[in-house]
Amino acid sequence: MEELCYFCLKQLFLEFKVENNSNHIIIRCTSDKLDALVAPELKSLFLHHSNNGANAFVVDLENVKYCDSSGLSALLVGNRILKEKEGKLVIFGINPMVQKIIAISQLDTVFNIFENEQIALNNIK
């Protein structure tokens, strides 16, 4: 029986759908929560894909209804990784409750947040 690597095993249980495009990666959160249980997987995705050459991420949070400090931390990790590579992270589809948490945390000045996917995609080019 073949052994699966840790990352491959985690892929089986991810709360995210990943789309590889020619000049960017779209990460769609399929969970309604971006919390301490889900955030490590998002961090792993940022690290894995950036280590494999990706320098532009589009994060779809349309399904996310709840985000805690772990979720915000995961997004900050992705943002930091991409800034170090002179890349870009854009986020779209944030619901009002999550937007409020981001604003209270004063991260609305840190993240590149857009209303919809098309506007987000236009801003990574």
Task: Annotate each predicted stretch with a short phrase.
Residues 2-27:
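Short beta-strand/loop segment at the start of cytosolic alpha/beta domains
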Residues 16, 121-125:
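Short hydrophobic/aromatic patches at helix-to-coil boundaries
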Residues 33-111:
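Amphipathic alpha-helical interaction surfaces in cytosolic regulatory modules
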Residues 112-116:
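Short acidic-hydrophobic, aromatic-tinged amphipathic segments that line or gate anion-handling sites
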Residues 25, 119-122:
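A short acidic, often aromatic-flanked loop/helix-cap motif at beta-alpha or helix-coil junctions
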Residues 29-31:
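Flexible glycine-/small-residue-rich
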Residues 96, 118-119:
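Acidic phosphotransfer microenvironment of two-component signaling modules
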